[in-house]
Each structure stands twice: as C-alpha cells, then as structure tokens.
C-alpha cells in the first residue's frame, strides 16, 4: 500500500470526519421498529435479570449482528498475509506479526493515554486487522505505514465511540515519527473506504456485562444483579478485560467471534485454573442456554487464554498491578495502563469526561 492510493481522497481533506450532532435526535433511547438493525443494542443487567427470555434474545441479536463482521474460521489474517507475500524475505514471516504486535501495543498505550473506553481500543485493533486482510502493506514501508494506519484506526474508533475525539495533531506517533493531519485524514478515508464504511462492529464488550451477570446469577443460585451481586459480576468483567486484550495481542481479533472471546474471557476470569472440556461446556450452558455460541471455539480460545496466563505466571516473579488494587493475571500492554474504575468498566460506556493529556509533538511537515 502506498500513499498514492489515498491521493484521490485529498480533495476531501479540508473537512472533519467527526459528525456534528448533539444527540438531541436520540430521544429517550427508544429505537424505532423500522430501523434497519444498524443501531447498537444496549444490555440492561437489572431488567434482564428479571427476564431471561429477554436476556437470551439480546444475546441472539448480538450473535446475529456479529456474523456479518466476522472472518471465516478457515481464513486467518496471518495465513492470508503470508499468502500475499507478507512472509517473503527472511523465510519465517515473523516481521508482519512483530509489526502488528507493535501496532496493537501502541493502540493500547494510546487508549490509556487519552482515557478511551475499552471498546474504542478493540474497535481500532479490529479495523487494523480488517484493513490488513484486504490490503497489503509493503515490508519496506514498515513500521511507519503501520503506525500511520494505527493512528487512523484509533482516530476513527474514537470518533465512533467517544464523546470527544482528539484532534489529529494530538496523536503521538512515537519513535521520532511525525505525521501531518492531512496524511492521517487521508489514511482515515482509505480505512473507511477499504472497510466499506462498516465501522459499527460488535465487540466482546457488548457481551461481557450480560455474560458476567448471568454466570454470577447461576453460580450463586439466582442472586439478583443488584448490590453485592452486581459488584462481584463487575469485578469478573473487569478481570476478563485483561484476557481479551492479551488475546488481541497474541493474534488477529478476526480469528474468533466477539461472543467467543467474551465467553472464554469470562470463564477464564471466573475460574482461573484450567477446566476440562466437559466442565467448560457445562459452565457455558449458563452463558447461553440455547447454545448460540460455538463450544469448540470457546474451548480453543479459553485454552489459549489460560495457557498464556500460566506461562506468564511462571515467567514473572510478581503479579502486575493495576488501578484500585485489582490484578489482571495476564501479561499484556493493557496491564501497564490504568483501567477505569469497576463501575465504569461494568457499564462499558464511554466516560463522560475525556481526561486527556495534551502532547506537544514537534512541528509537522
């Protein structure tokens, strides 16, 4: 991919991609039955606790929605990349994995820097993976092209999710790299066009509140979602976040459906010690009684999460700490940045106050 491919978009670089709306047209959150299904569904844990049928309907709708964004299980980003020449040169093809890992780490660090929500970071990683599945990035252009792509993906995700997104000049590319706002905006447009302007993908965070609440309720004999039960479910969901981002670092987020990742993360965060396949399938019935989630894929994803956790425990002399004395047992870039408090994390809503430090990058070309 070269910058020339984006030149056709240069005429549009004088405008902002941020939608100028104040939310007045959203009403009281009531969704018109005539909507085409592109609106996001929101999970109300307290209401759903009293109506498991409604809860299951929510999961069913989210699973159906995620299907349109998922990659075929037989097609991996890394397999496709290798087949498109990403593995040429040194014989092992690790350079693309390393470039992607650096991009994901930068995205997670940027999430912590600006105080973005978890969903924003995950969407940015998903945009990056989807883009690389459709377009080839030349090795000679790495790592600057991957960093420019990372900035564009985070910027678009922030415009999708945050109440206020940073100005393009606020993003610190790191490593002495400097990108002008026009270059970032052109890359944003290239990302949008490459992904067909379909940016509202489902993420594991759309399932976490529901899954953690259901698992806690069944585990404690039908305890309600209020009070101590809600706090306990929120703690499990918070710990699951670390597993989700550790998995995102380890491989493409397109390899597993968001519902699969969410289920595996909740189970890993809830039980820690490896469960047998039979025990895992038994626990899964509490998450989705109608078997909407593929058990084989959940088991594979869960095994990877727990395996990485055990490997990290053996290689680390002390656990990593995060805010509010909560420990994330996986070792990933996510662990080194501050997480939101438990209440905000359980809600998985963008924080109303975007706590933003303002970097001062050098003058850009």
From Swiss-Prot:
- Recorded GO CC terms: cyclin-dependent protein kinase holoenzyme complex; cytoplasm; nucleus
Tell me the Pfam families matching this sequence. Answer: Cyclin_C (PF02984), Cyclin_N (PF00134)
Which terms in the Gene Ontology molecular function aspect does this entry carry? cyclin-dependent protein serine/threonine kinase regulator activity
Among CDD domains, the record links this protein to:
CYCLIN_AtCycD-like_rpt2
Which UniProt keywords are present, listed alphabetically?
A: Cell cycle, Cell division, Cyclin
> Can the keyword Cell division be found in this entry's annotation?
yes
The highest taxon in the source lineage is Eukaryota
* UniProt keyword Cell division present: yes
Query: GO biological process: any one?
Result: cell division
Q: Which family does it belong to?
A: Belongs to the cyclin family. Cyclin D subfamily.
Q: Cross-referenced PANTHER family, in alphabetical order?
A: CYCLINS
- Name by which UniProt lists this protein: Cyclin-D5-2
Give the organism, scientific name.
Oryza sativa subsp. japonica
